[in-house]
Amino acid sequence: DVSDCSREQLEQLLDLAFSISRDIRAFENTRTGRMLVNLFYEASTRTRVSFEAAAKRLGMHVINVSATGSSVEKGESLEDTFYTIQAMGPDCIVVRHPEEGNATRLAAIAESGVHVINAGDGTRAHPSQALLDALTLKQAFPDFSKIHGRHPDF
């Protein structure tokens, strides 16, 4: 979640995203051979496709898993699904789940080296959207201090 990051970490992340947005070709295939899994328990178009497109531009292999058509329909728990996917060796698992806190819970049980990204958990948080909104502000106002007396608080 965004709240788990320090202001410095968020600024570094936004600086990197800003650099990528200005010259995407310089970053193409910089993560070749790595794997990202989109684990989505909710219908999604923009968020899932955004993660997939970004990962593919970086040269990553992408696997999309949804609750529909998976063993979740037969009663498999979120944790069992996560452990099964984790055993396949992904570098990153992007999680979208309708229940609050599940992405954080999965991050706590993830093996070292497996990064869990919260792509939305119920009505509580949508960190990737918050970061996109912050990037949009950074692109429009490169110096946040010039936003007429308002200072975004990360």
Can you say where each PLM-predicted feature lies in the sequence?
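Anion-binding alpha/beta catalytic cores of soluble intermediary-metabolism enzymes, centered on
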Residues: 85, 90, 94-154
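Structural signal for conserved beta-strand scaffold positions within catalytic alpha/beta enzyme cores
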Residues: 1, 38, 64, 116-118
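Charged, amphipathic alpha-helical interaction segments
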Residues: 22, 59-61, 138
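Conserved active-site and cofactor/substrate-binding residues in soluble primary-metabolism enzymes
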Residues: 5-8, 31, 42, 46, ...
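Positively charged, low-complexity intrinsically disordered leader regions
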Residues: 1-53
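Active-site cofactor/substrate anionic-group-binding motifs, chiefly glycine-
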Residues: 35-89
